[in-house]
């Protein structure tokens, strides 16, 4: 059971790293994630969130 939990955690961390690397930052300033939805869709990405005052878009 401990091995299964360790493998599950490793897979979760790897998927987070892959998801972050696929994203791209666009030059749109924001204060909350709701402001990023339309600019990210216009950039050809599906989702967006506000990180450090700029929109970060991801394809998933």
Swiss-Prot record:
PROSITE patterns: SCORP_SHORT_TOXIN (PS01138). GO terms for molecular function: ion channel inhibitor activity; potassium channel regulator activity; toxin activity. It comes from the Eukaryota. Coiled coil: none annotated. Disulfide bonds join 30-50, 36-55, 40-57. One of its GO terms (cellular component) is extracellular region. Residues 1-23 form the signal peptide. Expressed by the venom gland. InterPro entries: Scorpion_toxin-like_sf, Scorpion_toxinS_K_inh. It is found in: Secreted. Keywords: Disulfide bond, Ion channel impairing toxin, Potassium channel impairing toxin, Secreted, Signal, Toxin. Its main location: secreted. It holds the Pfam family Toxin_2. Has the structural arrangement of an alpha-helix connected to antiparallel beta-sheets by disulfide bonds (CS-alpha/beta). Potassium channel inhibitor. Belongs to the short scorpion toxin superfamily. Potassium channel inhibitor family. Alpha-KTx 03 subfamily. This is Potassium channel toxin alpha-KTx 3.16. It comes from Mesobuthus gibbosus (Mediterranean checkered scorpion).
